[in-house]
UniProtKB/Swiss-Prot annotation:
Record key words, sorted: Cell cycle, Cell projection, Cilium, Cytoplasm, Cytoplasmic vesicle, Cytoskeleton, Differentiation, Fertilization, Flagellum, Nucleus, Spermatogenesis
Biased segments, Low complexity type: 27-48, 122-175, 303-316
Region (Mn 2): 364-378
Name the UniProt record assigns to this protein: Sperm-associated antigen 8
Source organism of the structure: Mus musculus
Length: 470
């Protein structure tokens, strides 16, 4: 029961503390180790383990805890193995190589076959030992842990900051647990070059290497490309790991400022591209920035008149108007009204001088203008003598036109009634003794001169009226 509880306790704890690369000689906090026998550990002097399944040069895995073997190995169909870097202490390495044990080939594999699955982590312990008796003897150099089991036991004075280590050559109780291997496997003594981290390959990223300038391509004939330039050695691949990386030599300013073409045309037989190849380049650094030339123009544009200066007049400059103060008028209202009055007065004077005065005329038609007929107003004629309206017969429309109508009785006197003339139809015996037609009768109303009203219409007796003496 105690073994099961200790196993569960060891599995629940995680190996979070890893040795630091800056302080390799100082021990770190103790972490429980997965082993079934008491053992002592020593400070680790080598960096932490890294997995073969990941990149050797990855820095993110340095100091990461190692998960259980069944969590990783069963997913890929094989059991992964871990390697560590070669110890830096030659004495400890020689001591460990003298006690090599070829039986263990994996870091998480041990000669002891436990019933439970143990954790492959660092050999750091902080729990009291469940075995019998403390361990003694000199502590060897830190090596990767090569044991795993369900039981976790360690001495009360054991603490280490490197990978889990087996106990050194000291007296231990052989009856409390199996013996563990305390040496590096034969296959891990000489790590291949491809598995060891290549720090020389990272040197090319430490120093910035300026990009080499490209020379303008000059094409002599249409359709012919320039000469082939082989790539420089070492430009495509990293430098060899055996030789240390030296910082590249800084190129001179003339090399950086040398012209580089913007691009190349699709057809190499274009005359314009060949003519402007020298102009299509990056401006030198001493003349200003590249954006300055794009804002203010290019220095070497093609023109038919090389000596002609550039025009200073632009659309934006010509259409620019100075801002005006809207709140404050430029001149007063009295000045504006006086100017308007003077303008109208001067315009009238100039118009009067240029255009002559027109004469007033009456409206007349073409016929009136051609015949020059004078129109007379119609008015009653003036009376020659006074009239008595009581005794005289009034002038009417029929009296004025009585002489023009046929069969009308002749008017002999002014008091002659207006009636039909029946003298022509009267029988002869009845007409005897009667005056003849159109003869004036003698009477009190006989007038020697007929009124002008009777003669106005141009009657028959108007001009030949006979007067008889009284």
């Amino acid at each position: 029961m105690e073994t099961t509880e200790s196993t569960e306790g060891s599995l629940s704890r995680s190996c979070d503390v890893q040795p630091s690369s800056e302080r390799l000689d100082t021990p770190s906090e103790p972490v429980p180790s997965s082993s079934s026998s008491p053992r002592s550990t020593a400070p680790a002097e080598a960096p932490a383990q890294y997995s073969v399944l990941t990149e050797p040069s990855s820095d993110s895995l340095y100091g990461a805890p190692c998960p259980p073997a069944h969590h990783r190995g069963h997913g890929f169909g094989f059991q992964p193995f871990y390697v560590s870097c070669i110890p830096q202490d030659p004495c400890n390495m020689a001591d460990l190589s003298s006690r090599a044990d070829p039986t263990s080939s994996y870091p998480c594999h041990s000669s002891v076959h436990g019933s439970g699955s143990g954790t492959c982590g660092l050999g750091q312990s902080s729990e009291p030992s469940q075995g019998s008796g403390p361990t003694s003897g000199p502590a060897p150099a830190s090596v990767p842990s090569l044991v795993s089991g369900p039981d976790s036991a360690s001495g009360p004075d054991s603490s280490a900051s490197g990978p889990a280590l087996a106990s050194g050559p000291g007296p231990a109780d052989p009856g409390q647990g199996p013996k563990f291997s305390t040496c590096i496997p034969q296959g891990y003594r000489c790590i291949p070059v491809d598995l060891a981290p290549d720090y020389n390959a990272w040197c090319q990223h430490l120093h910035w290497k300026p990009q080499r300038s490209w020379e303008p391509l000059q094409v002599s004939e249409p359709g012919v490309r320039g000469p082939y330039k082989p790539p420089e050695p070492g430009a495509l691949g990293p430098c060899e790991p055996c030789e240390p990386c030296e910082p590249p030599e800084a190129e001179s300013e003339e090399t950086l400022c040398k012209a580089r073409p913007r691009g190349q045309c699709l057809l190499y037989n274009w005359e314009e591209e060949r003519a402007t190849n020298q102009l299509d380049q990056i401006p030198p650094l001493q003349d200003g920035s590249e954006s300055y030339f794009f804002r203010h123009g290019h220095q070497g544009l093609l023109t038919t008149q090389p000596q002609s200066p550039m025009s200073s007049s632009t659309t934006q400059r010509d259409s620019y108007q100075l801002p005006r103060h809207i709140c404050q008028p430029l001149r007063g209202k009295r000045e504006a009204m006086l100017e308007m009055l003077l303008r109208h007065q001067i315009c009238k004077e100039v118009q009067a001088e240029q255009e002559p005065a027109r004469k007033l005329f009456e409206t007349e038609s073409v016929t009136h203008h051609d015949y020059r007929v004078e129109l007379v107003r119609a008015a009653p004629p003036a009376s020659t003598k006074p009239h008595d309206y009581r005794q005289e017969q009034p002038e009417t429309f029929w009296i004025q036109r009585a002489a023009r109508l046929p069969g009308v009785s002749d008017i002999r006197t002014l008091d002659t009634p207006f009636r039909k003339n029946c003298s022509f139809s009267t029988p002869v015996p009845l007409s005897l003794g009667q005056p003849l037609p159109y003869e004036l009768e003698s009477g009190p109303h006989q007038v020697g001169v007929i009124s002008s009203l009777a003669c106005q219409g141009g009657g028959q007796g108007c001009g030949r009226t006979k007067t008889t003496p009284i």
